[in-house]
């Protein structure tokens, strides 16, 4: 798997990020299983497995996902520009139109309309 970046590590990262964005735990589980299968190789020779090292970093610190209702897109974009760690923005029909919901990993905070509260949660 010496190709930089390896197709397998990119696929695993895709499963992980898509799983977080869509709330599909089976995709997250798939990424974790792929990472586990490579763990010993990465530990032994991390320089030859940089794509996998990045995946392990994303497993340890997932990218925040900000889900937003139909009329909250502008606020979500402001948060994306202002946050210390820019979240992945995902439109979400299951929350109120003016609400936003911050998710990190598989944990989501209560839906919120206030931009300041979301920014505060992102900076913690």
Regions found by a protein language model. Give the residues of each.
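Glycan-recognition and catalytic cores of secretory/periplasmic carbohydrate-active enzymes
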Residues: 1-124
């Amino acid at each position: 798997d010496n190709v930089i970046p390896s197709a397998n590590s990119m696929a695993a990262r895709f499963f992980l990020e898509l799983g977080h964005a869509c709330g599909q735990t089976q995709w997250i589980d798939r990424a974790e299983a792929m990472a586990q299968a490579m763990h010993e190789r990465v530990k032994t020779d991390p320089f030859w497995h940089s794509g996998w090292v990045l995946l392990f970093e994303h497993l340890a610190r997932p990218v925040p996902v900000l889900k937003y209702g139909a009329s909250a897109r502008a606020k979500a974009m402001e948060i994306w520009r202002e946050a210390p760690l820019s979240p992945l923005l995902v439109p979400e029909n299951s929350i109120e139109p003016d609400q936003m919901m911050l998710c990190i990993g598989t944990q989501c905070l209560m839906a919120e309309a206030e931009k300041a509260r979301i920014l505060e949660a992102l900076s913690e």
